[in-house]
């Protein structure tokens, strides 16, 4: 378990098999989970429909809390899917970690900075498109010079720092959690029964804590995404 990422080259470009496989697993789990929860919808929800409606209300609450009412509905579905995808991505490495010949094959996609920075780039780019669509090109760029022109370089630094912190925060938490689980698993088999007795309870406790951390990081990511979009839409 663990090791270097499994990569291959195509047309001079290097592709990461680990991220492709792990991401595909997350997509499949997300699709079938939402498909299963949304089957047999009724006016009086029961079972899986209750869970689905709770998640929808939860993410809708995030959007409504950050965005003006006239635009919140447009981004509700995006935030819902993003939250579910991130939550499952954060938990995948706690359920499945598989390696072969010194290479990682399956892990949490969000334990790789390339994945999290790409998601952060998509979120920040969407916020800029939303700002242009709402305010127009002139109004969008005018915000960078408010309340006075000297704010322009400061706001550029702020934009870059928002991008970095959004992607690195979730990566750091998920990567650190999985790394500690690997260390505890290695310690369990290092000196036989004594270390196994000590490390196994610690690993169970840390896995439970990592589930909580993964949920919090998914919540933080989607909340900050809605904040960034709201700022561009409202011009604040």
From Swiss-Prot:
Membrane protein topology class: Multi-pass membrane protein
One GO cellular component term: proton-transporting ATP synthase complex
Domain of life of the native organism: Bacteria
GO MF term (any one): proton-transporting ATP synthase activity, rotational mechanism
UniProt keyword annotations, A-Z: ATP synthesis, Cell membrane, CF(0), Hydrogen ion transport, Ion transport, Membrane, Transmembrane, Transmembrane helix, Transport
Alphabetized SUPFAM superfamilies for the sequence: F1F0 ATP synthase subunit A
InterPro entries (alphabetical): ATP_syn_F0_a_bact/chloroplast (IPR045082), ATP_synth_F0_asu (IPR000568), F0_ATP_A_sf (IPR035908)
Gene Ontology terms: biological process: proton motive force-driven plasma membrane ATP synthesis
Coiled coil: none
Protein's cellular compartments: Cell membrane
Pfam families hit by this protein: ATP-synt_A
Family (UniProt): Belongs to the ATPase A chain family.
Subunit structure, interactors included: F-type ATPases have 2 components, CF(1) - the catalytic core - and CF(0) - the membrane proton channel. CF(1) has five subunits: alpha(3), beta(3), gamma(1), delta(1), epsilon(1). CF(0) has three main subunits: a(1), b(2) and c(9-12). The alpha and beta chains form an alternating ring which encloses part of the gamma chain. CF(1) is attached to CF(0) by a central stalk formed by the gamma and epsilon chains, while a peripheral stalk is formed by the delta and b chains.
NCBIfam families: ATP_synt_6_or_A, PRK05815.1-4
Its job: Key component of the proton channel; it plays a direct role in the translocation of protons across the membrane.
Protein known as: ATP synthase subunit a
The species this protein was found in: Limosilactobacillus fermentum (strain NBRC 3956 / LMG 18251)
């Amino acid at each position: 378990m663990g090791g270097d990422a499994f990569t291959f080259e195509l047309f001079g470009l290097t592709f990461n098999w680990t991220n492709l496989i792990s991401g595909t697993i997350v997509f499949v789990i997300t699709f079938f989970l939402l498909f299963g929860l949304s089957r047999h919808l009724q006016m009086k929800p029961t079972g899986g429909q209750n869970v689905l409606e709770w998640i929808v209300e939860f993410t809708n609450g995030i959007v409504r809390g950050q965005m003006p009412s006239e635009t919140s509905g447009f981004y509700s579905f995006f935030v819902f899917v993003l939250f579910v995808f991130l939550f499952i991505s954060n938990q995948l490495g706690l359920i499945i970690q598989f390696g072969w010949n010194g290479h990682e094959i399956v892990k949490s996609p969000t334990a790789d900075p390339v994945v999290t920075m790409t998601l952060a780039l998509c979120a920040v780019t969407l916020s800029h498109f939303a700002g242009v669509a709402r305010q127009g090109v002139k109004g969008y760029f005018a915000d960078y010079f408010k309340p006075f022109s000297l704010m322009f370089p400061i706001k550029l630094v702020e934009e870059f720092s928002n991008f970095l912190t959004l992607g690195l925060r979730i990566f750091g938490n998920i990567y650190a959690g999985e790394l500690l689980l690997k260390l505890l698993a290695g310690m369990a088999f290092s000196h036989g029964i004594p270390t196994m007795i000590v490390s196994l309870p610690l690993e169970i406790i840390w896995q439970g804590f990592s589930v909580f951390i993964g949920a919090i990081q998914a919540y933080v990511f989607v909340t900050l995404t809605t904040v960034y979009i709201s700022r561009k839409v409202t011009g604040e």
